[in-house]
């Protein structure tokens, strides 16, 4: 039992790998589009707003981009809840970062055939070959900039992944076999790793609910979850807001206790 995230470039053609893994392992398959639709229903945002938050940095008029960060928190919470039961393949933007720190998460980077990507863009958009190449470069650059803005890391840094497969060199079937061999040997769920995922789901849910509450200045309050205990940290000026967060946290499934501490200014 494990979780697999597949990351790829725009028009990467990775869906076949995801479907192969889902069928051979008996895992559920969750796409970004399905996740965003469910997230929009749960948190009251539109899929377009959520997708924009997952693809683009804030514009010049958005300041620090707090609204986008709140939407990202909502997506993280929705994803964490959906993979809590394990046996899931997620195909979408930044899944390996949204679930970072979960030991039974296998983070796979799928490198697509460049010509396949170009052909896919040309077929869908009717771009010329040169325009399709330019478009892919722009999309990849935007994604890289987004990852650096949100997480402070390079999307292409190999240390952010556990495994890479190159579809220009191996078939979909072989890529699927490589991933299956890796996940079954090295990424099985333990009680300890499950608790880490449960805490991630709780913490991200609290942060998502905070961000949607206009009466809470969420950038001034820190939330941590460990072993089902939520700890809320705020300075003395924001204790009233911290009390609101405590009430939110108590309503979230899996929370055993809620504590509040005063953070140093």
Label the model's feature ranges:
Residues 24-30:
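Post-Walker A helix-loop "phosphate-sensing" segment adjacent to the P-loop in P-loop NTPases
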Residues 111-151:
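A glycine- and Lys/Arg-enriched "phosphate-lid" helix/loop adjacent to the NTP-binding pocket
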Residues 5-19:
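Glycine-rich phosphate-binding P-loop
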Residues 35-87, 127:
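ATP-dependent small-molecule kinase phosphotransfer cores
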Residues 88-124:
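ATP-dependent NMP and nucleoside kinases share a basic, alpha-helical "lid"
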Residues 1-3:
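Extreme N-terminal starter segment of soluble prokaryotic enzymes
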Residues 101, 112, 119, 123, ...:
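N-terminal targeting leaders
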């Amino acid at each position: 039992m494990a979780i697999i995230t597949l990351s790829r470039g725009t028009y990467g053609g990775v869906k076949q790998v995801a479907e192969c893994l889902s069928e051979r392992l008996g895992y559920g398959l969750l796409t970004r589009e399905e996740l965003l639709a469910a997230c929009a229903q749960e948190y009251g945002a539109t899929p377009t707003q959520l997708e924009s938050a997952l693809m683009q940095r804030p514009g010049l008029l958005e300041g620090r981009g707090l609204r986008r960060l709140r939407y990202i928190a909502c997506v993280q919470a929705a994803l964490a809840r959906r993979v809590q039961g394990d046996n899931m393949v997620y195909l979408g933007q930044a899944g390996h970062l949204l679930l970072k720190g979960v030991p039974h998460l296998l983070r796979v980077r799928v490198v697509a055939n460049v010509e396949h990507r170009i052909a896919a863009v040309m077929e869908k958009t009717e771009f010329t070959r040169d325009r399709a190449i330019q478009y892919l470069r722009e999309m990849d650059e935007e994604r890289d900039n987004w990852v650096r803005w949100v997480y402070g890391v390079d999307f292409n840094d190999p240390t952010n992944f556990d495994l890479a497969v190159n579809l220009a060199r191996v078939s979909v079937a072989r890529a699927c076999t490589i991933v299956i061999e890796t996940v079954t040997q090295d990424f099985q769920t333990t009680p300890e790793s499950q608790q880490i995922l449960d805490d991630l789901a709780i913490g991200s849910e609290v942060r998502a609910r905070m961000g949607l509450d206009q009466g809470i200045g969420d950038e001034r309050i820190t939330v941590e979850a460990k072993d089902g205990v939520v700890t809320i940290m705020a300075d003395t000026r924001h204790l009233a807001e911290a009390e609101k967060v405590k009430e939110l946290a108590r309503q979230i499934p899996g929370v055993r206790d809620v504590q509040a501490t005063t953070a140093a200014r």
